[in-house]
Amino acid sequence: MKKTISLLLLTVLAFLTACGETAAELPLPDGLFTQIQSAVPMENMVDVSEDFLESNLGITAEDHDGAVYYITAVGASCEEIIILRAKDEKGAAAFYEILETRLAYIEKSAQNYLTEYLPMIASAALRKDGLTVSLIVSPHVAEIEQVYDSFQ
């Protein structure tokens, strides 16, 4: 009987310990983008965070704990990578909605003018990993998501 109770307690303890584990927090957006750059070719991408975060997304420096916004610098392409670190869960939910709206805007624009990019847009990733919210519109989505997954 003692063995059965001990075994049951040990099982419950192991279960509670496993449930208490939290996923590793992603690096801040600039560090995460550096990791992405080292794993995936990112030529011709330019940081437009200072100019476009507020004008395109309505996000100010006071709204986040870190942000990067990269677009293709050459030609007319829909490639964008936006990574935002919210201050709290409410902010992360708001960022998700903002990036969801941004993705819809990119898709609508491409349907009218840049139809060759529709497959890339269709495979875009909109992610929420804890307080980090990201929009990845890139031909390298799978490789970029592997970088994210390496922190889990």
Model-predicted regions and their roles:
Residues E89-K128:
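Short Gly/Thr-rich strand-loop-strand
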